[in-house]
């Protein structure tokens, strides 16, 4: 058996090229930028969803479990990508890599592929489960085409990726031969067809997930503008379609490349971007709730000089109108506080006794004031009546319950 020079180049250099095994040219700075950026975006999206769903909405459902599992596997894949920065490096020609350095590279490629094959189905099934909660009422699920569509896509994702993970770990016998080519008598099969099949399945599922909710959204009973906004939010799945399509293209190119290590870099980048897009899509529905609860929208409006007053006529606007009708009310008692009906308007302060007609709702459709109630508060505990017949109440029996 011929001996293998493990310290020699992994590929014979082309004519006019000389192997540089000690300090090969690379683009590791670009790799760090792409990988760190994807990791930061993924982490921010995961934390935003956790804050919006678990902290604000007090919900920890199946979607949160799946998203957490996906995030854990994402870092398994990310760890493998960072390890490949050291050996062999990104955009390094194979003739500039020692043959022995291919062994750990093959190992980290296997780890990345397995984790990647867990991340995407976890995320996509989480998205589908959440959409079923939003768009399909209980008791009507088996009658809904949308629900069955979600079930079919989820089933395809679960079964196909389980099979892919099994196949990745059974591509060679013995198992160690997957990454260590030095093992004698090993039997392996071509992995490229499996990689292309995986990329094709994910692209088809991404397109189906992108199109699936559009018909349901445009049948919702809401204004055209709101339907457009909801459609855009759920249409962000187009990002996943683009990244999956490019990933499929670079996968096909990778299988045909003679310089496989050099062609590995774009494949890793686009697969990582595809996972990041998945986390972004999972996070987006939680952002409006977070912006509302944290007051970000209110602060943005103030920064641009826009009004932050509520626009619901059943609350503050109705009160403002009642204050312009010319009713002159007075009080000798302390300030009173009130709470409007449940429209999210904060407590306000009334200086003096004022009309409470706005609490009754817009009964006469804005046709004028039908009754005005005046309250006078005295400083003692006796129930009295003034000369104008206004009702007075002891401090311990305030009718507004404060």
From Swiss-Prot:
Residues covered by region (Disordered): 312-335, 378-402
Transmembrane segments: 28-48, 109-129, 145-165, 232-252, 264-284
GO cellular component: membrane
Membrane topology: Multi-pass membrane protein
Sequence ranges of Polar residues compositional bias: 324-334
Pathway: Secondary metabolite biosynthesis
Glycan-modified residues: 381
Keyword annotations from UniProtKB, A to Z: Glycoprotein, Membrane, Transmembrane, Transmembrane helix
Pfam family membership, one: Fung_rhodopsin
Predominant subcellular localization, coarse grouping: membrane
Keyword Nucleus: no
Compartment(s): Membrane
Domain of life assignment: Eukaryota
Function noted in UniProt: Part of the gene cluster that mediates the biosynthesis of the tetraketides fugralins such as linear fugralin A and cyclic fugralin B, volatile compounds that play a role in the asexual reproductive cycle but are not involved in pathogenicity. One of the key features of fugralins is the presence of a double methyl group, which is only rarely encountered in fungal secondary metabolites. As the fugralins cluster does not contain an independent methyltransferase, the PKS FGR1 is probably responsible for adding two methyl groups to the same carbon atom.
Family: Belongs to the SAT4 family.
Name of the protein described by the UniProt record: Fugralins biosynthesis cluster protein 2
Taxonomic lineage of the native organism: Eukaryota, Fungi, Dikarya, Ascomycota, Pezizomycotina
